[in-house]
Amino acid sequence: MTKQQNQAEALSVRQIPFAEAEYEQALKLRDEVLRRPLGMSIADDDLSGDADALHIGAFARSGAGDAHAERLVGTLLLRALDGRTLQMKQVAVEKARRGTGTGRDMVRFAEVRAAELGYGEIVLHARENAVPFYEKLEYIREGERFEEIGIPHYRMRRELG
């Protein structure tokens, strides 16, 4: 699928329920995008915190079909660190959708939802190659580079509101 075809598909972003079909699709996408390229499996991850997280999904649909024709093309989750701060984790967009605004739309949706819930900031650990993406979205890099799951990361933060 080309970027032009991807841009022709309608994109909707919404919160998805834990432990239902959309969550299972999100797990599969997280595995394909974030774990398999590193020779890892999401089955080896500690997913116990997922039950308390806020899950966001981006869904593509071409034409005027019904919701059942939608497919998950991006996902992320937010975990509360305290009453003011959420950590954004597991941001994954299918390869064919990168560069089409899918990631940006998910992050912006997550920020609005976080603010609605009374949170004042989002923090994240960005893979080194994703830092420019987050900087465009006004996230500030903090501290030195560190390794997580064997690859370089930076801590980033954005104040909401």
Predicted segments with their positions:
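A short beta-loop-alpha structural element at the N-terminal edge
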Residues: 10-26
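Active-site rim helix/loop that mediates acceptor-substrate recognition in acyltransferases
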Residues: 28-67
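Conserved beta-strand in the GNAT
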Residues: 57, 66-80, 87-92
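A conserved beta-turn-beta hairpin within the catalytic core of GNAT-like acetyltransferases
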Residues: 80-89, 98, 148-150
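Conserved acetyl-CoA-binding loop-helix of GNAT-fold acetyltransferases
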Residues: 93, 99-112
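Conserved GNAT acetyl-CoA-binding A-motif
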Residues: 107, 114-127
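Conserved catalytic-core motifs of GNAT/GCN5-like acyltransferases
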Residues: 123-125, 135, 140-157
